[in-house]
From Swiss-Prot:
Residues 55-73 have a biased composition (Basic and acidic residues). Pfam families: MIS13. InterPro entries: Dsn1/Mis13. Keywords: Cell cycle, Cell division, Meiosis, Mitosis, Nucleus. Component of the NMS super complex which consists of mis12, mis13, mis14, ndc80, nnf1, nuf2, sos7, spc7, spc24 and spc25. Interacts with dis1, mal2, mis14, ppe1 and ekc1. GO terms for cellular component: condensed chromosome, centromeric region; kinetochore; MIS12/MIND type complex; nucleus. This is Kinetochore protein mis13. It is found in: Nucleus. GO terms for biological process: attachment of mitotic spindle microtubules to kinetochore; cell division; spindle attachment to meiosis I kinetochore. The keyword Chloroplast does not apply.
Length: 329
């Protein structure tokens, strides 16, 4: 067998074959002939699949035949249970679902997953405690879990949701916004109760102030009635000699007592009105005082503009000279 000649192109050797004489002659004839022309053409693409492709798709849609390929590489834990043995220890528990046969029904798959995960957790707990002080308590807990798993294997505990009663009501999970709204209702109801208590306290204070005003008025009327009775007694019957020196003292105390009583009633009324008015009255008084101060300040500034300092000093010197001359005289 003859080797094809090699040509060096840089550092790469390319092996080329011999060109046929017919192809060279055909190329030269096409290039030499000026009458030949090239035309572009369109090739239509198929819009739909061919009948054979359609038939193959229909065949693939059907259920495939049962194959023994799915059963390869699986170990049976026991013949009676029908469940597979635990996966390898290196397989993490969150990937157990990948090793469960897809041919099983959903209840059996969840049962298989529950058995695998529980067995793996028991083994981890056994390695964790070992011979520690809590080993005996952990062993008791593991024995209880193992009994539950044995009952699950013996089909004494059912995890199938197909056998539940048809009228069973499944509670819906509460919406997070509803939980927040319930919490807000509790907070606002507590706030409303506090406000009601404050309102009741203020109403009690107001009722006490009104009752105190009424008691003062009734006391004042009683004093006036007593004074009127005493005046009538003075006019009708003379006083005994023992009470004669005390008359001037009582007559002197009467006007003071009336004035003190009026001042007390006025102060109580003022305090009550200020308590009811609250911060609005204080803010209004402060606003008026600030306005008066600003107006007074502006008037002083405007007056100082028109006053001449030299004339002011001259007037002060004349006043001091006149006062000194008057003192010398």
């Amino acid at each position: 067998m003859k080797r094809k000649p090699e040509e060096q192109e840089g550092f790469v050797f390319v092996r080329k074959g011999k060109e046929k004489a017919g192809s060279k002659r055909r190329k030269s004839s096409v290039e030499d002939d000026p009458d030949t022309s090239q035309t572009d053409g369109l090739v239509e693409l198929p819009v739909s699949d061919t009948p054979i492709v359609k038939r193959n798709k229909e065949l693939r849609k059907g259920k495939g035949r049962r194959s023994s390929l799915d059963q390869r590489g699986k170990r049976a834990s026991s013949i009676g249970t029908g469940f597979e043995a635990l996966p390898h220890a290196d397989v993490p528990s969150h990937e157990y679902y990948r090793h469960i046969s897809k041919d099983l029904s959903e209840p059996l798959r969840i049962k298989q997953l529950l058995l695998w995960a529980s067995s793996k957790a028991l083994e981890e707990q056994r390695k964790k405690y070992g011979e520690t002080e809590e080993a005996s308590e952990a062993a008791i807990a593991r024995s209880i879990v193992q009994e539950v798993l044995n009952e699950l294997l013996a089909n004494k505990v059912s995890v199938s949701w197909y056998q539940r009663p048809p009228d069973a009501v499944i509670p819906n999970k509460p919406h997070p916004q509803n939980l927040k709204n319930a919490q807000l209702v509790d907070e606002l109801s507590a706030k409303l109760t506090q406000l009601h208590n404050e309102e009741a306290a203020w109403r009690a204070v107001a009722a006490n102030s009104v009752s105190s005003d009424k008691s003062i008025l009734s006391f004042k009327k009683a004093v006036e009635s007593i004074d009127s009775k005493q005046d009538l007694d003075k006019q009708d019957s003379p006083l005994p000699p023992d009470d004669a020196p005390e008359l001037p003292n009582i007559s002197k105390l009467k006007p003071k007592f009336h004035t003190l009583l009026d001042m007390l009633a006025e102060n109580i009324h003022t305090l009550h009105s200020l308590t009811n008015a609250g911060p609005e009255v204080r803010s209004s008084y402060g606003r008026l005082a600030a306005q008066d101060f600003i107006a007074h300040r502006k008037s002083l500034l405007s007056f100082s503009k028109y006053v001449d300092t030299m004339n002011l000093l001259r007037l002060l010197s004349e006043a001091s000279y006149k006062s000194s001359s008057n003192e010398s005289v």
